[in-house]
Amino acid sequence: MFNLIRLGFPRTSIIRYYSSTAVNQAKVYSRTYKRAGPVTKSSTSTSRSTSTDASPASSSPPKESVSDIEPSSEVPVKSTTSYILHDAPLEASNKNNGETINWSDSFHGLGAQPFSKEIAEILLAPVAEEDIEIKPDGLLYLPEIKYRRVLNRAFGPGGWGLAPRTESLVTSGQISREYGLICHGRLVSIARGEQDYFGGEEKLTTALEGCKSNALMRCCKDLGIASELWDPSFIRRWKKKYCEEIFVEHVNTKKKKKIWKLKSIKTIDYPYKMT
């Protein structure tokens, strides 16, 4: 580097040269490397930054924050939320000196004492084998009306009920809800029913009824109604006696598969046909 003093430059000129150079470099550094603050700011920091950064030399327009940009109405927004039915159980009032029971969270009478011998005989009676049905996948079931008839014989019409304990949980393809079975003013069982549905929101009402029926079947299992349907030895014997497994073909896709059916049924429902 050249020594400016030896070359004959006066000290005053040298000092002015360095000071002006430092000022110019500071301005260039400030314009080139200044970064914008974060998007979310408090009102105090935003106003302070605006007053500090405003200068005649800055020609770039202020940047819009993310919150100021409105989404375009032309772009469809795909919703991933579930349906909300707003069917949570109502809270019971305490105006009757505690006589009203809120069955959405109460366990009143659960396991307090057994039912009478007459009721127990009706509940534990063997299931009529001709009432049992089978699904194509081999699952045995009893129609819901059969459970209701047993409960009516045991407790009498009006002597039992199914009370919801939670709000319905709805997803894109399934609905579920927890119910409690009350018999003669006592909680006897709690179960969560579920039901798959297809076709959108308009199918929710039917799916909710199927969910309630599924919960009733699960609650009746605790009372011993049709307990044979969970006995593996009974299932094997009943299938061998009343059912058969056959090959069927899908009418449209021509795919073949095995399904179960009752021997007494000679036809196959659409869209399958016997091969």
UniProtKB/Swiss-Prot annotation:
| Family the entry assigns | Belongs to the MGM101 family.
UniProt KW keywords: DNA damage, DNA repair, DNA-binding, Mitochondrion, Mitochondrion nucleoid, Transit peptide
Biased segments, Low complexity type: 38-64
The answer to whether UniProt assigns keyword Manganese to this entry is no
Which species is listed as the source? Candida albicans (strain SC5314 / ATCC MYA-2876)
Q: Name one Pfam family in it.
A: Mgm101p
Extract the InterPro entries matched here: Mgm101
Q: Recorded GO terms, molecular function? A: DNA binding; single-stranded DNA binding
| Record's GO cellular component terms | mitochondrial chromosome; mitochondrial nucleoid
Transit peptide boundaries, per UniProt? Answer: 1-18
- The UniProt annotation puts the region (Disordered) at 34-77
A GO BP entry is: interstrand cross-link repair
User: According to the UniProt record, which cysteines are disulfide-bonded?
Assistant: none
Q: Which domain of life is it from?
A: Eukaryota
- List where in the cell it is found: Mitochondrion matrix, Mitochondrion nucleoid
Q: What is this protein called?
A: Mitochondrial genome maintenance protein MGM101
Q: What does this protein do?
A: Performs an essential function in the repair of oxidatively damaged mtDNA that is required for the maintenance of the mitochondrial genome. Binds to DNA.
